[in-house]
């Protein structure tokens, strides 16, 4: 009897085990479906969203585990644990390991093939020679209007390429990590009565060289242009590119306000500002955005190449690298360039390393949008243009950020010898802007600037530089460092004049009643001249009076700041008898003749007597 029932019992037991196994599989599949749905729909954009999601997952897991463990006799028992999630940094996006591939960094648009013999092809010069009378008139009109050869630009393709990638090998071979991911960017281009060809070549250049996954949009900000072709015609042209938008200021407010308008409508994670007459070289964008991903408080500029204003030849980078420059400032608060100090060259291992710069030109740079807003964007009370780049340079460094130049990022720019634009209220707005930055950021060192610029001193005395209380509050809120810290830590090479000098101002000769003057286009290495005293200041080149047996010359000062010394030829004694005595050559300065020179000291000679006078 027992033997007859055995097959039936075995069959019943087998069905029971199969039933339990089916339940296990079903419950496990339900668990996977719920878990996948939770992961798929939840976008981990901020830390606040992590806890509820993890809680939901834990609840689902608990139900599943309890159900499975309550099924007695199920073998083997299954132990399921939720995957351990790594701690998430606020603001960090989900990213994959490894590096971006060339396919992932494919440009937004493919550049059309060009005729290698076309005007300006491959970035070559287009020389306008043998023009007929009509062409000559057109060329002259373009130069007068735009201060560059618009005739040449108009005949160069909007789509021209720049030939082979001639950057150093480490730039061409540079890989970019997927984690943290490269941020998206909004390109902001401000224009006012810009030439059609230079503006549109800038736009096309961006689209042909910027990865599609990084290029969020191109925002063209019209600062009240009056040229008709920049209105409906421009709007119609950019309709073919959904990524390009035009916003307009109804009245001329200048670069600063226009950039703030562009930033206010931008949706990218970073902002990239370009001028309206640029061309971007291969791989220009990735190094800028990679540096911001690595250091969100870095404000980064490309290596700016020159586009010749006459021929539009693009000065391409060298594959062997080259000596770089960085930004500086003088005590007239003008921007300039200088070669890198030895310690900065030593710090950098190759061309992929950023260059730290005390100031930046301010026309071409990228910055995190969040950081741009946090650090105070631009001073909204500054007018039109001028001084905003020096102000931002001081502010970024003093408030915990840093300015850098990325040599592997190359952007060409048409450098003009003068501006084609007039400014409402004239150039006084620039001086007013400079006074605002000096009052907020320079502490006691602002007095050096006021001694150099009589117009600035008047603005301060009359208190016509506007309300700066918001900018002072910003400095206090961000707990920014003082200007002494900036000079000591960011720019120790700067020449800092005495805060309380024994003498300052113009240097007037008693004999001819004329003043010592730099003269035109004297950037060092040329003699000085005697010129009618005007008391306007200007021409402050941070150069030194260098004694020699012929006419004395202006030369680059051997005194460079801390731990440096001036050579004897640049050390002068203003003696009680009003002579200027050079100890190295034991001679005195005379103003007799076309150029000041040295002569045997004669205290009775009125041409050897000099007095300092304050600028009016």
Swiss-Prot record:
Q: Transmembrane segments in this chain: where? A: 13-33
Extract the GO molecular function terms from the UniProt entry: carbohydrate binding; manganese ion binding; polypeptide N-acetylgalactosaminyltransferase activity
Task: Identify the pathway.
Answer: Protein modification; protein glycosylation
Instruction: Give the organism, scientific name.
Output: Taeniopygia guttata (Zebra finch)
Q: What is its cofactor?
A: Mn(2+)
InterPro entries per the UniProt record, alphabetical: GalNAc-T, Glyco_trans_2-like, Nucleotide-diphossugar_trans, Ricin_B-like_lectins, Ricin_B_lectin
Name of the protein described by the UniProt record: Polypeptide N-acetylgalactosaminyltransferase 3
Q: EC annotation?
A: 2.4.1.41
Where along the chain is UDP-N-acetyl-alpha-D-galactosamine bound? Answer: 517, 520, 534, 539
Q: Which residues form the Ricin B-type lectin domain?
A: 512-616
Q: Which residues bind Mn(2+)?
A: 275, 277, 413
The residues that the database entry marks as glycosylated are 482
Which cysteines are cross-linked by disulfides? 515-533, 588-601
Q: Where in the cell is it found?
A: Golgi apparatus, Golgi stack membrane
Cellular component terms per the entry's GO annotation: Golgi cisterna membrane
Region (Catalytic subdomain A) residue spans: 182-291
What highest taxon heads this organism's lineage?
Eukaryota
Task: Give the keywords, sorted.
Answer: Disulfide bond, Glycoprotein, Glycosyltransferase, Golgi apparatus, Lectin, Manganese, Membrane, Metal-binding, Signal-anchor, Transferase, Transmembrane, Transmembrane helix
Biological-process GO terms, alphabetical: protein O-linked glycosylation via threonine
Record comment regarding domains: There are two conserved domains in the glycosyltransferase region: the N-terminal domain (domain A, also called GT1 motif), which is probably involved in manganese coordination and substrate binding and the C-terminal domain (domain B, also called Gal/GalNAc-T motif), which is probably involved in catalytic reaction and UDP-Gal binding. The ricin B-type lectin domain binds to GalNAc and contributes to the glycopeptide specificity. Essential for glycosylation of FGF23.
Q: Where is this region: Catalytic subdomain B?
A: 354-416
**What chemistry does it catalyse, as a reaction equation?**
L-seryl-[protein] + UDP-N-acetyl-alpha-D-galactosamine = a 3-O-[N-acetyl-alpha-D-galactosaminyl]-L-seryl-[protein] + UDP + H(+); L-threonyl-[protein] + UDP-N-acetyl-alpha-D-galactosamine = a 3-O-[N-acetyl-alpha-D-galactosaminyl]-L-threonyl-[protein] + UDP + H(+)
- How is it placed in the membrane, per its record? Single-pass type II membrane protein
Functional description taken from the UniProt entry: Catalyzes the initial reaction in O-linked oligosaccharide biosynthesis, the transfer of an N-acetyl-D-galactosamine residue to a serine or threonine residue on the protein receptor. Glycosylates FGF23.
Family in the record: Belongs to the glycosyltransferase 2 family. GalNAc-T subfamily.
